[in-house]
């Protein structure tokens, strides 16, 4: 009974949130959604990340194996046209290795050499071998640190006990020191200058910066500083690629 209720709620949410909204904004069989590049009264993000409204196409479900394909099947390309799906391979890890190499941080040399010798290098696999931990755990820690995730949240993502998480972090930072060093440098820059400028010139200010020890009870500006450095640069390269297309 509980599963049936949960399933009914999921179907109702899909209908009211997605299907009704899509039909509402449909005009002659087409959807003309608003693409927000900057924050405004009509939507958008303060970081400059693309967002959609009327309807929000980024919320079209994908994980539900039954409802997802059915709702996404509503969208088809124009006649004689084909849709493409493009994605950079491990964008964040490549940027981390790039900037860690520029700063000559300890431990990044072997990873940088791997990228130079093989463009298909798997960063998470290399880090897993360096730290002596499973690849999935290495990937979770990598992405968590790139985005300024605190220890408690990382522990929850890893699904391990506090003691096990502490041991994993210790092992990771001892064997892969350049990731934490780079994140600390970004945090220090935001603290000293009160701002970070992205590759495309976007200025992100931190007037309420609260310095804290890395990864422990992080303040929101700390997370924002890391997001503006790595993912902010990632967005810049993605925008350039979109313009070329």
Language-model-derived ranges and their functions:
Residues 1-245:
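Conserved catalytic core of nucleotide polymerization and phosphodiester-bond processing enzymes
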């Amino acid at each position: 009974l509980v599963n049936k209720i949960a399933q009914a709620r999921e179907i109702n949410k899909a209908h009211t949130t997605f299907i009704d909204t899509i039909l509402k904004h449909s005009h002659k069989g087409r959807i003309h959604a608003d693409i927000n590049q900057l924050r405004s009264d009509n939507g958008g993000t303060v970081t400059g990340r693309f967002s959609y409204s009327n309807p929000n196409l980024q919320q079209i479900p994908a994980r539900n194996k039954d409802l997802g394909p059915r709702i996404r099947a509503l969208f088809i390309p124009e006649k004689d046209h084909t849709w493409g799906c493009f994605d950079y391979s491990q964008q964040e890890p490549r940027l981390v290795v790039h900037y860690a190499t520029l700063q000559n941080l300890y431990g990044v040399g072997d990873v940088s050499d791997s990228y130079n010798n093989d463009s298909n290098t798997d960063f998470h696999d290399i880090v897993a071998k360096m730290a002596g931990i499973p690849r999935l755990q290495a990937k979770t820690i990598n992405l968590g640190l790139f985005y300024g995730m605190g220890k408690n949240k990382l522990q929850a993502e890893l699904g391990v006990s506090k003691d096990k998480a502490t041991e994993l972090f210790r092992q990771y930072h001892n064997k892969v020191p350049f990731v934490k060093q780079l994140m600390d440098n970004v945090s220090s820059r935001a603290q000293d200058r009160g701002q970070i400028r992205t590759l495309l010139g976007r200025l992100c200010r931190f007037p309420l910066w609260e310095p804290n020890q890395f990864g422990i009870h992080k303040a929101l500006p700390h997370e924002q500083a890391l997001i503006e450095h790595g993912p902010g640069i990632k967005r810049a390269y993605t925008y350039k690629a979109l313009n070329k297309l």
